[in-house]
Amino acid sequence: MKYRIEGHCHTKDSSPCGQVYAEDILKAYQENNYSGIIITDHFSYQVFGNNDSWKNIVDKFLLGYKNAKKLESKYNIKIYLGMEIRFTDSYNDYLVYGITEEFLYQNEWLYMKSLKELKTLSKDKYLIIQAHPFRYGNTLADLNLLDGIEINNTNPHNICNNHLAYNAYLKSNLIPTCGCDFHSIDCISKTEYMEFFNLPKDNSELVAMIKQRKYIIKTK
């Protein structure tokens, strides 16, 4: 058996640009035969600012993930915690897989730091993947600070120049990932996704399987 996993998903619960609440997201992915979703809501100064306590900011960020997580058994879809972080020095976005709630609470003002600092903090326990590196306004980051590149962002509402991301991946030793950059129901891809040979039981296993390349990227 093989398992479809969404690698890039935003909820209306936590991301202002999201158009669909967590439960409706799970319903839609169940209808499209997915087995897992990595919730990667936006985590940035633009979204959360610095006028609230860090605890309240993290609470708000985690809302979409937690609302989805408690519905896992109802929809038979595994939910994994991730994020799409943007620092204040550029418009680049980075998907981070494997993070824990504790990590977020302990590292105050994480999005006010830098990619280099995040790499140090991750201690190779998490995966840092540059999302849509060739979308307008984005530039390819220092490859030494990345674990992977999103080589196929299938969002129908943005031009991501995936061919350039794929070429950059081919010239590197980085991990390739794929995701629909979900914001609305029409984003879900029926033909392009990450397909795992086994369903990761938790975030740690998800990271391990991706590092070991125990998945393939399905394309049209």
Q: What positions do the PLM features span?
A:
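Binuclear metal-dependent hydrolase catalytic cores centered on His/Asp/Glu-rich metal-binding motifs
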Residues: 92-125
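Surface-exposed amphipathic alpha-helices with a cationic face
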Residues: 4, 69-73, 114-129, 165-172
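Conserved beta-strand positions in the central sheet of alpha/beta enzyme cores
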Residues: 38-39, 129-130, 150
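Active-site-adjacent beta->alpha loops and helix N-cap segments on the catalytic face
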Residues: 61, 108-117, 159-167
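Charged catalytic cores and adjacent phosphate/nucleic-acid-binding surfaces used
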Residues: 1-7, 11, 15, 21-27, ...
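Aromatic-lined carbohydrate-recognition surfaces of secreted/lumenal glycan-active proteins
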Residues: 83-84, 126-134
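An N-terminally biased module of ancient metal coordination in phosphate/nucleic-acid-related enzymes
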Residues: 1-88, 184-186
